[in-house]
Every structure is written in structure tokens, then in C-alpha cells.
Amino acid sequence: MIELRPLLQLNLEDGIPVLKDLLTADSFSFTDVELLRYIPAIAKNTPAQTRDLAASVADALDVDQTTALAAIEALVELGLLVPSASISSQKAGIQLWVDKGWVDALILHFASRNLNYNDDPIEFGGLEDIKSYPEPMESKRRKRGTATRLVKPSRELAAAVILDGLMNRRSFKPFTRKQLSITEVSEILWFGNLYARERAVIAENRDFESPRDIAFDSAFSALSTFVVTYGQIDWQDGSLPPGVYRYNVVNHELEAIRAGDFKLDMAKLAIGQSRASSGLFTFVICGDLKSYTSRYRHERSYRNLLINTSQLAQFYLTLATINDFNTFLTPAIHDEKMHLFLEAEDDLPLYLVTAG
């Protein structure tokens, strides 16, 4: 039994058709362009034995079997048609991504995984000359408005629950939830910031264990989350009016910035995306690049900040899914206007996550 490699991308390079295997990064050039017309028919009729495949392709393309067999043998010689047993595990892995609706993400991953970054060597701006740096900037933040202390979650999340949240999240499900509890807000923020909380305490108290701990500090220490709620949240001991809040990750509390219904404002700030404020709440993840680069003095710092931002967003998305919310995320924000709206001081708006 033979069949085509499972994840092929067709490109034109210097006017010559090239099929690229995204899994292995192998490329296959076609000097005989006529062979390309056989590939769709082969894909529809494999896996199959060579002779059976030739008959099916000949029938599909209205050519004789000898011609079809010659094309198939040419593709085998190129390495595009391979024994089915050699790619069974690859097919199973790809099919999982297809079933979950993650095809675009899979293609982007394979297309970008081997990109080279032109960073300076670690000896420049890294650990070797950390002693010549001045002390890191103070990272203590001023207290904002009235703070609402959140109760630490009473449950722990089992690995199976987290995996279920990861596998079941979708980007385009409609919002269906009508109410939001303070327990759900607390749980998402608490578990989403476990590592960020640890690093923030270290940075705020300047409790670095060594120069290395300063030089290679995680960007999680420089991330903060602003919470925008679109309806009043009531519970036994209090209530939280709709408005904008800054999450104090160290104290696990929400500091009031401004009260009001900001659905329309948030949609405009998300460049007109109504879905950005159609849920029950929005998290705006921000980063203090200046503070972070004062500790990690390397050009990788900006990239690290963006990567850790996306990781925090993934935590929020997964935790929201665990709590039966549907989600939406976007980096498409009017940066300066959002910064002013949030009164974010040194924090730069980077990513927006909405759930409902």
C-alpha cells in the first residue's frame, strides 16, 4: 500500500512548482509539471496498491493505465508517494489537529519552527557582564482604587481537567453564558497567574537569588491583567459593579479603575470587533517592557515578553473553558487609546481575551 506524504504545501520557487513536506521540511521540485495534475486524483484514491491506484487514476483523469502507472512510479521515485506503514503515526497526529479545527495553527507551526533569529550571543548583554549593570528598576506599583479581595479557590485542578480544557477550547463558538460568578473570576485569575505571582513577588521584593536570576528573569514578572466586567457580579459578602479593574497578582485582589458599562468602548478599542466585548468579561494582558528589560538586558527580552504574554493568554483561555465559558482572543487593539482607557501607566496593552 502506498500513499502521499500527509502534509504537503505547494509553492512556486523561481517559477518552478515545489511541493514541501511541512513535517520533514523536504522539498520536491517538478521539472515535469504534468505530474502535478495526478496528485489530486492520487490523494482521493489512496492508500492503495500500485496497480489498483493506476486503474483508479486512469479512470479519474481519462488516461490509459500505462500513462497513469508511469506517473505514479515517477512520484514514488521522487519520494512523494511512500509506503503507508511509514507514515501511519504522522497521519494520526495530523488528523487529531484536523479534528480539533487547528489546521491553520499546525501549518503556521511547521512554517515557522525553523526560523533563525539574529540575536547577539549571550556573552553580549547576558550573564557575563551582569555585574556592570546598575541595579534593576524598582517594580513596585502604586495602589489603585478600592480593592476587592478575591477568595483563593477551594479546589485544585487535576491534570485531566486541564487537559480537557486544552482539548475542548474553540475560538469561534458563540457566547452562551448569561451570568458570571466571583468564584469563576477568582479561579481563572488565581490559577492563570501561579507562576506570574511567584515571579512578581520576587521582582517586587528584589529577592533575586543570584545575578543569574536577575539576568534571566521570566517576563511573567512584568505582566499584568486588567479586567473589564460588563454586568454586576453579586455574591453573599458583596458585589462588583461593571467597570475596569486591575488585578493585583500578589494580593489576589481587583483594584477599581473606573465603573461603568464599557461594552461599546471596548469594541471600538478592539478596532471595531464587537465580539471583543460581547461576552461577560474581558482580560487585557499588558506588559511593562521597561521594567523587564532593566533586569533581562538582552534583545531577546522583547520576544520573551510577547511569548509569555501568549502563554498567559492560553492559561486564561483554558481556565475559562474549564469553567464552561466560550472564548475570543485578539491582539488587534488601538494600543495608545487602550493604554489611556485602562490608565495603565507603564503597562503596554498586548493581548485581549474575552469569555462568555
From Swiss-Prot:
- Provide any one GO MF term from the record: oxidoreductase activity
Out of the domains of life, which is the source? Bacteria
Note the PANTHER family from the entry: NITROREDUCTASE MJ1384-RELATED
| Protein's recorded name | Trifolitoxin operon protein TfxC
Q: Which organism is it from?
A: Rhizobium leguminosarum bv. trifolii
